[in-house]
């Protein structure tokens, strides 16, 4: 990378490099992915002023006085997006230690840890995330809302966040925070204020309660999960009537709906109800994928989550091992079928199941199952922007859009793992990172106990 002309920088107290609002910056690289094209643009140039892109193209003439950053043999790209994260939760270590930690760790401590996870994520090149669930046993705190607001105010360095707060699910289901514990250990049954519902009326109350408390998107569990003790992985957990109420109330309030779903029947009923995305989708059959295609529903496959769980399978109880293996064995065929059928695929990882900041490993998993590298890049840029409802301002390198820009070495269409070596991150015109990443804390880079609720 070469920096030419005089580069005036201000180091903010949180370590973000900011430029004066009227200063023009030119970013150059041998290649550029604009977020939509089927091939890379050669000799890419992006001109930034303030928080916006003011010009972009190949071999652009750089305005006089602009500060130039030339990355050489590298590729510019829109900032990546991850449509399935849990930034306020910790990733899974030993399952039994995690269960104990759920009862002993202060939620305030997790809020502080979340700031570390947020920074690790944005420094990895992910400038936007859809954070789809934040809950703690016995607590009604909205930590994800607080983290989003702190990032928006510039108090914390992190990605742009769209948050789902607690998530919605059935009594005894995947999202029930008391499930798997002794009856009434917490003094009461979970209710709609915890996201737990047992009727269409409960669903509407829960949606309204979460929107009232800051939800940008609504998340629900419509089938069992891998990392929950008291359910089967593919059983339906909401009735068709409850799912209809979920979609109707959420869309009435102009919120999109993402549903955790492994099972085929639950996926089919959710798609028919009109949800916006299916998260995981492990056991979906071709007939259900056809319905998905016809409805325009997105698939967020979260391949990295199942990959991580299988690599640590001995850390889980036997019942969870059986569920994990079943989901893992089914997901590859489902994903290949989705590719063949032209299903809309978004990039989402389930970060928290694995260490935060390793999100980009999802790219290699997708290409390993047959997706082309350029299409994989598109999932994390323009596809995610469409799903998240922010395509008018982010997701592509276009004049007038927010200056969320990253650089990675070499050519990611020749070596997709280049996405794991992002060297430069700009978010809304501010440089978050330029050069090697700072050493990660133990909380991000090693295997401490996961003190989250089940998320997969």
Where do the model's predicted regions map?
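Histidine-rich, glycine-flanked metal-binding segment
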Residues: 32, 36-77, 100
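Metal-associated gating/positioning segment near the N- to mid-region
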Residues: 74-153, 174-175, 241, 265, ...
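Active-site gating loops and adjacent loop-to-helix segments of metal-dependent hydrolytic enzymes
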Residues: 88-110, 171-191, 226-238, 295-328
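Histidine/acidic-residue-rich catalytic or RNA/ligand-binding cores of hydrolases
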Residues: 91-94, 144, 173-175, 228-230, ...
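His/Asp/Glu-enriched, well-ordered alpha-helical/loop segment
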Residues: 100-102, 252-256, 316, 326-412
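Divalent metal-dependent hydrolysis catalytic cores, especially in the metallo-beta-lactamase
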Residues: 113-141, 157-167, 215-228, 256, ...
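Histidine/acidic residue-rich metal-binding segments in metalloenzymes
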Residues: 146, 201-299, 326-345, 392
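C-terminal cap of metal-dependent C-N hydrolases
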Residues: 380, 386, 399-443
């Amino acid at each position: 990378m070469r920096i030419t002309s005089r580069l005036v920088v201000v180091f903010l107290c949180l370590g973000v490099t900011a430029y004066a609002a009227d200063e023009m910056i030119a970013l150059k690289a041998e290649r550029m992915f604009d977020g939509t094209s089927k091939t890379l643009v050669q000799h890419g140039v992006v001109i930034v002023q303030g928080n916006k892109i003011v010009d972009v193209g190949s071999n652009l003439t750089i305005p006089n006085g602009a500060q130039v950053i030339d990355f050489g043999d590298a590729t510019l790209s829109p900032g990546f997006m991850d449509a399935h994260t849990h930034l306020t939760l910790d990733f899974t270590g030993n399952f039994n230690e995690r269960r104990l930690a759920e009862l002993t760790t202060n939620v305030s401590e997790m809020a502080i840890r979340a700031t570390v996870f947020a920074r690790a994520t944005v420094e990895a090149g992910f400038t936007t995330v859809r954070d789809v669930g934040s809950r703690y046993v016995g607590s009604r705190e909205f930590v994800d809302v607080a983290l989003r607001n702190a990032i928006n105010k510039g108090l914390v360095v992190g990605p742009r966040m769209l948050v789902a707060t607690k998530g919605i699910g059935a009594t005894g289901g995947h999202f029930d925070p008391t499930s798997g514990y002794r009856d009434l250990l917490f003094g009461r049954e979970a209710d709609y204020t915890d996201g737990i519902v047992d009727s269409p009326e409960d669903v509407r109350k829960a949606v309204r309660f979460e929107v009232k408390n800051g939800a940008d998107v609504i998340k629900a569990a419509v089938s069992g999960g891998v990392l929950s003790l008291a359910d089967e992985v593919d059983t339906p957990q909401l009735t068709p009537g409850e799912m209809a109420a979920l979609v109707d109330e959420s869309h009435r309030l102009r919120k999109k709906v993402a549903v955790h779903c492994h099972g085929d029947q639950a996926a089919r009923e959710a798609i028919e109800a009109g949800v916006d995305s299916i998260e995981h989708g492990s056991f979906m059959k071709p007939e259900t994928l056809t319905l998905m295609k016809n409805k325009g529903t997105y698939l967020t496959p979260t391949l990295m989550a199942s990959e991580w769980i299988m690599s640590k399978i001995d850390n889980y109880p036997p019942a969870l091992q059986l569920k994990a293996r079943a989901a893992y064995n089914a997901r590859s065929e489902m994903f290949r079928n989705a590719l063949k059928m032209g299903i809309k695929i978004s990039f989402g990882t389930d970060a928290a199941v694995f260490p935060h900041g390793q999100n980009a490993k999802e790219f290699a998993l997708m290409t390993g199952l047959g997706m082309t590298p350029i299409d994989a890049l598109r999932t994390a840029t323009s596809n995610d922007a469409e799903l998240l409802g922010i395509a008018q301002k982010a997701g592509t390198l276009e004049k007038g859009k927010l200056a969320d820009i990253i650089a990675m070495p070499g050519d990611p269409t020749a070596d997709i793992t280049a996405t794991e070596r992002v060297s430069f991150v700009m978010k809304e015109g501010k440089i978050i990172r330029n050069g090697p990443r700072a050493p990660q804390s133990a909380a991000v880079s090693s295997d401490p106990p996961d003190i989250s609720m089940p998320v997969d």
